[in-house]
Design a protein with these regions (language model features):
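Beta-rich, blade/repeat-based domains predominating
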Residues: 164-169, 253-255, 327-332
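Beta-rich carbohydrate-recognition and catalytic domains
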Residues: 1-32, 36, 40-99, 108-161, ...
Length: 358
């Protein structure tokens, strides 16, 4: 699990700081990997990680660890504190004894004054988005699976889904009513990268590649305690693969944070490796930046033409899954400020230096 931090100074820069958390020798809960963590700052002011811990047989739990900082103020290590969630609900377990609580994201939802975790529950039917709430980050109440209403005649209830995160404030839905908004990546049949990797161009079907969607549900203190909470009834396809580095699919990454330019997310895109070695994984996961309109997040103000992070280090080119960088949380630097280059790219759409390949 590597960390990278953005410094908004004379220009937006991305610097790798190193490995923050690795598999603990002798820990059976981590024998197959430690990856894809959520992060959140608790009521005590501490920063906590919620990594996916993978045991033998791809059995995944969500751990909790306190981040330790060095004298320079950079993350330097973690203190393991136990398990936040492990497969217990029916929708997290499979008949063969397997299961998983995977790839969490955590947002403090301000109108509800509560932390919301979105995670992938590896159910008997396949991966689904599950929700949980907490007041302190240590005690979590499951809300069950998120459900999605039909979209233009397409039934979404039985569609696999991943990479979910919610906005921290109410967002106008397509009708203009403020609701809880979630970013997610439905896996419609026939859209997986392995299925379309040899297709030279998009097919006629509108839902031909995995994309980032935004969906909405009623949000209030009353709805939180009812069975209406987590029922997302209106939808909008936010973004589809555009650039070569994301040709096969895109998916959500970090939960959205508000800047003066709009909602900032770091997302992932997948492309085919040009010259994969024999027996190697043929897909490459990279990261890009997207900025959404503050008032109308379904409007994209900017997105990366080139990736801002690609797998280059040995730990990124081999391991649990090869050739992958996968963003799940960003933490603004303490003295971060908007830059001229960011203002310029939002004004005229030009690609700044920090979005170009080295």
């Amino acid at each position: 699990m590597a960390i990278a931090e953005r410094h908004l100074m004379s220009g937006l820069k991305l610097q790798r700081l190193g490995m923050l958390m690795e598999q603990e020798p002798g820990n059976a809960q981590e024998v197959e990997g430690v990856l894809n963590p959520a992060a959140a700052r608790g009521p005590d002011g501490e920063l906590y990680l919620f990594p996916r811990l993978v045991a033998r047989g791809n059995y995944s739990r969500i751990g909790i660890a306190r981040v330790r900082f060095n004298k320079a103020g950079d993350p330097a290590g973690v203190e393991r504190l136990g398990i936040a969630l492990e497969p217990e609900a029916d929708y997290e377990r499979r008949p063969d004894g397997g299961g998983g609580c995977e790839d969490p994201r955590i947002t403090f939802v301000e109108p509800l004054q509560i932390y919301m975790m979105t995670y992938t529950a590896f159910s008997p039917e396949g991966p689904r988005i599950a929700l949980a709430l907490s007041k302190d980050l240590f005690h979590w109440k499951r809300l069950g699976l998120a459900t999605f209403g039909p979209y233009h005649g397409v039934e979404c209830g039985d569609v696999d889904d991943k990479d979910a995160s919610v906005f921290p404030v109410a967002i106008p839905n397509p009708s203009g009513h403020p609701e809880l908004a979630i970013l997610h990546r439905p896996l419609f049949p026939g859209t997986r990268p392995e299925e379309i990797v040899r297709h030279p161009a998009a097919r006629k079907v509108d839902l031909d590649r995995e994309s980032i969607w935004i969906s909405y549900c009623v949000m209030s203190l009353e709805s939180r305690e009812s069975n209406r909470f987590g029922r997302f009834m209106s939808h909008h396809r936010l973004a589809t693969p555009v650039s070569p580095w994301e040709r096969l699919k895109i998916g959500g990454g970090t939960p959205p944070i508000l800047t003066r330019h709009g909602w900032l997310i770091v997302y992932h895109g997948v492309s085919e490796m040009e010259k994969p070695s024999v027996g190697e994984h043929q897909l490459r996961y990279s990261a890009g930046v997207m900025v959404l309109s503050k008032e109308h997040p379904q409007i994209i103000r900017y997105r990366s033409v080139e990736p801002v992070l690609t797998p280059t280090l040995p730990q990124e080119c081999s391991g649990t899954v090869a050739h992958v960088v996968f963003p799940t949380r960003h933490r603004p630097a303490r003295r971060s400020r908007p830059t001229q280059s960011l203002r310029r790219l939002l004004r005229d759409g030009r690609q700044p230096d920090w979005c170009r390949k080295a």
